[in-house]
Design a protein with these regions (language model features):
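Conserved C-terminal helix/tail region of periplasmic/extracytoplasmic solute-binding proteins
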Residues: 301-319
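Soluble non-cytosolic domains of exported or imported proteins
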Residues: 44, 71-75, 90, 150-151, ...
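Pocket-lining segment of extracytoplasmic ligand-binding domains
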Residues: 94, 178-265
């Protein structure tokens, strides 16, 4: 297995240069005009409270004009943020932690979706006839993950080691979430860590089953992602940052209580079939900005050398 830190080195080095070169400057606006904020995000349920905040007018009520740029990957979002093409972007905790330790001045300004053992949106699946019950049963097997050296690998390697297996013997195969169900069915992989809505589609085929809530090995609750900007942007736009955070927290509270209504909003942005969105487990959004929800991911990532060392979660949060 490739050393996780090596997989990040070139990209992170490029980001450092881009951040230094760009500088974050607020978009000029007339006194009575809303402040434009360019936000990068994927069309995923884990960011759907952003869509809710726009549709419900939470940003507009605070004098913000949030313009979404839908992007295909977290790496693309980070590069755009570093280069000054975005003001705010969504990022998972492992990626942001790695960037922080490389000296890239990214900081979380609002929480995103959290893993919740009572309503998991990412699960480990296996073939329907698989005998897998513990990590030992997966030793030496092929395992599908969305990205190497990231959350989708951190969950299973932690679970495998904590249930009698040896995560270092696993061959982790990077693949799109949408293709994981088919990969299980073909026998290309013996298990996979699948997020919604691909999870719902894979299970509906009847060829796969849930084998474990692998993220439970990290913690029963932890932050999956959040909203980052540069420290320079925070310094120059403190009021806008506070307003953005407040709007996102209001949207989180609304979304957690209104799954059906928020699903209708999400359908406007997602490429997933409407019936899949209706059936899948919806994301749980953090209703407070709590460093304790970030810390388990940082600690586990450091243990498995996905990042160089552990550090206090507060170091990457602008509270």
């Amino acid at each position: 297995m490739h050393t996780p830190r090596l997989l990040r080195s070139c990209a992170l080095a490029a980001l450092v240069a881009a951040v230094v070169a760009s500088g974050s400057v607020a978009r000029p606006a007339a006194a009575d005009a809303p402040l434009t904020i360019r936000v990068g995000a994927g069309a995923n349920d884990t960011v759907s409270n952003l869509f809710d905040a726009i549709q419900l007018g939470y940003f507009k009520a605070r004098g913000l004009d949030v313009q979404i740029q839908i992007m295909n990957s977290g790496a693309a979002e980070a590069a755009a943020l570093a280069g000054g093409a975005l003001d705010i972007a969504e990022s998972n905790v492992v990626s942001t932690s790695a960037a922080h330790l490389r000296g890239i001045p990214f900081t979380y300004i609002a929480p995103g979706a959290e893993y919740n053992t009572n309503a998991p949106t990412t699960l480990m699946i296996c073939p329907k006839n698989s005998p897998v019950k513990t990590g030992k049963d997966l030793n030496g097997k092929n395992f599908g993950v969305v990205a190497l050296a990231d959350l989708s690998q951190l969950g299973p390697i932690t679970w495998i080691d904590s249930t009698g297996g040896d995560g270092s013997t696993i061959h982790y195969v990077e693949m799109p979430a949408a293709g994981m169900g088919a990969a299980i069915e073909r026998g290309t992989v013996d298990a996979a860590m699948v997020p919604e809505p691909a999870l719902q589609i894979a299970l509906a085929s009847g060829a796969s089953k849930v084998c474990a809530k692998a993220f439970d090995a990290v913690a029963p609750a932890f932050m999956l992602n959040g909203w980052i900007t540069t420290t320079d942007y925070v310094k120059k736009n403190p009021a806008a940052v506070r307003k953005f955070r407040d709007a996102m927290l209001d949207a989180a509270k609304w979304a957690n209580k209104n799954h059906k209504a928020s699903a209708e909003i999400f359908k406007q942005y997602s490429k997933a079939p409407p019936d899949v969105i209706d059936a899948m487990t919806r994301a749980t959004f953090a209703e407070k900005f709590d460093p304790d929800l970030f810390q388990p991911v940082i600690n586990a990532a450091a243990k498995y050398k996905f990042i160089d060392r552990p550090f206090p979660a507060a170091d990457i949060l602008t509270l």
